[in-house]
């Protein structure tokens, strides 16, 4: 079930799953805190939860967590930016404070660029939405004459920033996202594109490990309670290795 980024809807969907008598739930929470009441209901019903990608705040209510090394996903973007701007520069940060995985990405990015001459001009909470990022970036472009780079906690936000940058003819700005989605890789591969890199994860590996973990739980076998998948930079130097037609 897709919650369409609506925490209340997701909680409602989980109650429907409980009523259906499902054996297990794979969960990527819209909001890592607001999901708690639904998790308590699942626990009371004896339904194990395999938490994916974004870790819930109270991990005691889940059976396992399979996700990406989100801090590293942001860190590799910051490291790449330092190579492009060795003297530092002026940057913007687009985040999503309600999603812990995005918070970790931004933390990793800021750790990578600390003490390297970078100034954060402003930050925006765009909830990972392309349209919100687009509208906010248009305002920032009017507000700041000098912007060297933009770090986005999701590729979707980065694509919105890219749209605004392209419309304003500001391709001198370096844009980073995180996820490694096909559309982001397609933009990175374009000659002259301002989208220069993404801290990539592998949903394929997450899904594979999640399925194996669920089977182990249901069959009462041993399993790893926490699995962290590798994250890595995809930029113009290596995007062809990963392709643009699907996820890695």
Question: Which residues are covered by each model-predicted region?
Answer:
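Proline-centered loop/turn at the N-terminus of a beta-strand
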Residues: 46-50, 90, 174
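Short beta-strand elements in bilobed, periplasmic/extracellular small-molecule ligand-binding domains
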Residues: 1-3, 90-95, 110-131
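Flexible loop/hinge segments that line or gate small-molecule binding clefts
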Residues: 32-72, 181-194, 243-245
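Hinge/cleft segment of the Venus flytrap/periplasmic-binding protein
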Residues: 101, 111-113, 180, 202-248
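Short, solvent-exposed amphipathic alpha-helices that sit
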Residues: 73-80, 101-119, 132, 136, ...
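Hydrophobic alpha-helical
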Residues: 14-43, 109, 121-122, 127-186
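Hydrophobic alpha-helical segments within soluble ligand-binding/sensing domains
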Residues: 10, 66-91, 132-134, 158, ...
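Short beta-strand segments enriched in small/hydrophobic residues
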Residues: 24, 29, 63-64, 90-98
């Amino acid at each position: 079930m897709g919650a369409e980024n609506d925490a209340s809807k997701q909680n409602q969907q989980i109650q429907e799953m409980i009523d259906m008598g499902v054996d297990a739930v794979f969960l990527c929470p819209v909001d890592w805190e607001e999901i708690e009441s639904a998790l308590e209901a699942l626990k009371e019903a004896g339904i194990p939860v395999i938490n994916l990608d974004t870790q819930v705040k109270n991990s005691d209510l889940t059976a396992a967590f399979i996700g990406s090394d989100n801090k590293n996903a942001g860190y590799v973007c910051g490291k790449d930016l330092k190579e492009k701007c060795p003297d530092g520069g002026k940057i913007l940060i687009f985040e999503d404070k309600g999603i812990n995985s995005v918070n970790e990405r931004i933390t990793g990015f800021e750790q990578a660029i600390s003490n390297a001459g970078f100034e954060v001009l402003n930050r925006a909470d765009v909830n990972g939405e392309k349209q919100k990022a687009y509208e906010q970036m248009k305002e920032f472009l009017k507000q700041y004459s000098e912007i060297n780079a933009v770090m986005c906690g999701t590729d979707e936000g980065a694509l919105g920033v890219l749209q605004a940058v392209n419309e304003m003819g500001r391709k001198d700005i370096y844009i980073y996202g995180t996820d490694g989605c096909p559309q982001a890789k397609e933009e990175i591969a374009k000659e002259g594109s301002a989208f220069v890199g993404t801290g990539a994860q592998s949903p394929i590996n997450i899904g594979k490990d999640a399925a194996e973990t669920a089977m182990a739980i249901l069959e009462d076998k041993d399993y790893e309670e926490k699995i962290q998948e590798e994250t890595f930079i995809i930029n113009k130097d290596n995007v062809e290795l990963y392709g643009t037609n699907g996820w890695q």
